[in-house]
Amino acid sequence: MAAKNVVVIGTQWGDEGKGKIVDWLTDRAQGVVRFQGGHNAGHTLVVGGKKTVLHLIPSGILRDNVTCYIGNGVVLAPDALLKEMDMLEAAGVDVASRLKISEACPLIMPHHVALDQAREIAKGAGKIGTTGRGIGPAYEDKVARRALRLQDLFHRERFAAKLGEVLDHHNFMLKNYYKVEVVSFNQTLDGMMAMAERLKPMVADVPRSLYEANKAGGNLLFEGAQGTLLDIDHGTYPFVTSSNCTAGGAATGSGVGPSAMHYVLGITKAYTTRVGSGPFPTELFDDVGQYLGEKGHEFGATTGRQRRCGWFDAAALKRSIQINGVSGLCVTKLDVLDGLETVRVCVGYKIDGEACDILPVGAESITNVEPIYEDLPGWSDTTVGVQMFDKLPQKAQTYLKRMEELCEVPVDVVSTGPDRVETIVRRHPYEA
């Protein structure tokens, strides 16, 4: 049978529940690929009631026979990776023999973290709300063609020469502009070299490995981090992350051609959340917003920050569906809406008195939009753990069907709880 590749993408501002869905889909995949972002992602998996949070290693690591890949589009913090490996291996998960890392990954280093944190402090109230982990500065170095890549780590003299140049540049900024302490060359060099030996066995030609896996009939799963509305090009710029979190990023960030992406699964919550700064048209500041946050346990897996909550935004989802070429939707956290008398859906916006049915481009265009709502009846029966669509409360079914009508894409999967088994499958992505 020919191999099939599925891309999992967040369609909102991240935190849509991708980790659980990737973990569930790995049942059908022989390889799972991270293709963008860094250890700013927080993917929470619950298996048999046991909770694991992964930041860098693909969620497929919890399945014994799955090979995990970190593609060239990921910025790699070696210390964070080794810490995560140690945590998993202490829990009995074999990582080292099942993880392949692209030699082209740019490295996140101490000067990137120092810059990230100094900038956020300097911006004060105008801050973007980064995780302070050096992600943005590492991507900047990549684009400026001065990044140190994983392959450089195994050549001490080459690494030292490049590091000297890069530190001259960044330390000048840290000292003279941000007025903070500079980063030590010797400490950085010794620290990075100390990690090289453990990393070396996992370094691979990832594009070739993925090509060979497909050729041998293996299904691949591409695991997106963050969400479409945080994409550097298509998100609510400048309140965005520094990578392409859209389906197109799966191709560039892994070295697998776009024609090999056979199905794109867009993950969306049954409501909307956002972490950090930036426009959010359907944000709620009332008791309902509080209720969604508490019932949905809306605290970031990476930062612990409380997420902002609001109604489901079909106009924003429509933008994500078009950008990603979404084949089908997976709706998560439906149970959080259980018990609400009325459920509101944003179907468009008023902008300067004119109606618009799709999210405008860029933060400035979105800041003053007025959402246009459609009210749907809520349901009182629980949806928790339901595994058949027709066993959902009738009004919950109506809500999901309305979502399909508004977005013109089928709801193929519904998540009704954090565990793998709490899933309704209407059309399986690997069978679609």
UniProtKB/Swiss-Prot annotation:
This is Adenylosuccinate synthetase. The lineage of its organism: Bacteria, Pseudomonadati, Pseudomonadota, Betaproteobacteria, Nitrosomonadales. Belongs to the adenylosuccinate synthetase family. GO terms for cellular component: cytoplasm. Its EC number is 6.3.4.4. Homodimer. Mg(2+) binds at D15, G42. GO terms for biological process: 'de novo' AMP biosynthetic process; IMP metabolic process. It holds the Pfam family Adenylsucc_synt. It catalyses: IMP + L-aspartate + GTP = N(6)-(1,2-dicarboxyethyl)-AMP + GDP + phosphate + 2 H(+). Keywords: Cytoplasm, GTP-binding, Ligase, Magnesium, Metal-binding, Nucleotide-binding, Purine biosynthesis. SUPFAM superfamilies: P-loop containing nucleoside triphosphate hydrolases. It is found in: Cytoplasm. It comes from the Bacteria. GTP binds at residues 14-20, 42-44, 307, 333-335, 415-417. Substrate binds at A301, T302, T303, G304, R305, Q306, R307. The active site is at D15, H43. GO terms for molecular function: adenylosuccinate synthase activity; GTP binding; magnesium ion binding. Plays an important role in the de novo pathway of purine nucleotide biosynthesis. Catalyzes the first committed step in the biosynthesis of AMP from IMP. InterPro entries: Adenylosuccin_syn_GTP-bd, Adenylosuccin_syn_Lys_AS, Adenylosuccinate_synth_dom1, Adenylosuccinate_synth_dom2, Adenylosuccinate_synth_dom3, Adenylosuccinate_synthetase, P-loop_NTPase. IMP binds at D15, E16, G17, K18, N40, A41, G42, H43, T131, R145, Q226, T241, R305. CDD domains: AdSS (cd03108). Binds 1 Mg(2+) ion per subunit. Its cofactor is Mg(2+). Pathway: Purine metabolism; AMP biosynthesis via de novo pathway; AMP from IMP: step 1/2.
